[in-house]
Amino acid sequence: MALKSYKPTTPGQRGLVLIDRSELWKGRPVKTLVEGLIKTGGRNNTGRVTMWHKGGGAKRLYRIVDFKRRKFDVPAVVERIEYDPNRTAFIALVRYEDGELAYILAPQRLAVGDSVVAGVKTDVKPGNAMPFSGMPIGTIVHNVELKPGKGGQLARAAGTYAQFVGRDGGYAQIRLSSGELRMVRQECMATVGAVSNPDNSNQNFGKAGRMRHKGVRPTVRGVAMNPIDHPHGGGEGRTSGGRHPVTPWGKGTKGNRTRKSKASDKLIVRSRHAKKKGR
């Protein structure tokens, strides 16, 4: 899909660059593969804001996407490529030989009428899924599982991919878009190809209202708040904050390391921060 720019006939059109979605399905999604989506406005079960800058936006239906791809050795044909408001990638509706319908993430170069299949060892072509144990080294993949059978978790956003670079003692080594080199079990599934819609990051929405339609609220600077709301708040007139930049909870926000170690850190061979100074 190409980018589409607009003539500045109004201020909101000036600089507007959007994805040309003219080739996507224009109808409704399959009713049996959608469910209602309740808006949280960024609040958790106690009513407190746990994710800032969320709220409002157009009503959505959640498309149930198959991230597991565990229907082995049953070919499926791509019926259509669809827009999904819940993710940056496009999704593909596939019909299996036994008649079952499912949504999968659409990789680049997947077209209507193409055949896809999941299995222990399949052809290396976009949309086919297999475990790393049956995959040749060097393959570009997406929708990578971290735990066998859990479903794909890595490389699911538009244009992303990982590369299978080696095997080591029952583990597969993969290089992620961030530069991180990590290991996952060879039994983990992955889908061949890079995720569709690679130009997503080149869009310019042109006006605040389009971001509000997407459910994104304004980002307020700490120095513009009151002292009760942020450590940088308050003061007479405009101030610089008066201290090193911190989050609303007082943690350093410009490069300070605040994350705790996780058990899965031992599977990271090379950190995505490896090139940074002092890492």
UniProtKB/Swiss-Prot annotation:
Similarity section: Belongs to the universal ribosomal protein uL2 family.
SMART domains named among the record's database cross-references: Ribosomal_L2, Ribosomal_L2_C
Domain of life: Bacteria
Gene name per UniProt: rplB
Biased amino acid composition, Basic residues: 269-279
One GO cellular component, as annotated: large ribosomal subunit
GO BP annotations listed: cytoplasmic translation
UniProt keyword Ribonucleoprotein, yes or no: yes
Region (Disordered): 224-279
Cited InterPro entries: NA-bd_OB-fold, Rib_uL2_dom2, Ribosomal_uL2, Ribosomal_uL2_bac/org-type, Ribosomal_uL2_C, Ribosomal_uL2_CS, Ribosomal_uL2_dom3, Ribosomal_uL2_RNA-bd_dom
Oligomer status and interactors: Part of the 50S ribosomal subunit. Forms a bridge to the 30S subunit in the 70S ribosome.
HAMAP family xref list: Ribosomal_uL2_B
NCBIfam families: rplB_bact
Its biological purpose: One of the primary rRNA binding proteins. Required for association of the 30S and 50S subunits to form the 70S ribosome, for tRNA binding and peptide bond formation. It has been suggested to have peptidyltransferase activity; this is somewhat controversial. Makes several contacts with the 16S rRNA in the 70S ribosome.
Record protein name field: Large ribosomal subunit protein uL2
PROSITE patterns, A to Z: RIBOSOMAL_L2
UniProt entry tagged with the keyword Ribosomal protein: yes
Keywords: Ribonucleoprotein, Ribosomal protein, RNA-binding, rRNA-binding
Gene Ontology MF terms in the entry: rRNA binding; structural constituent of ribosome; transferase activity
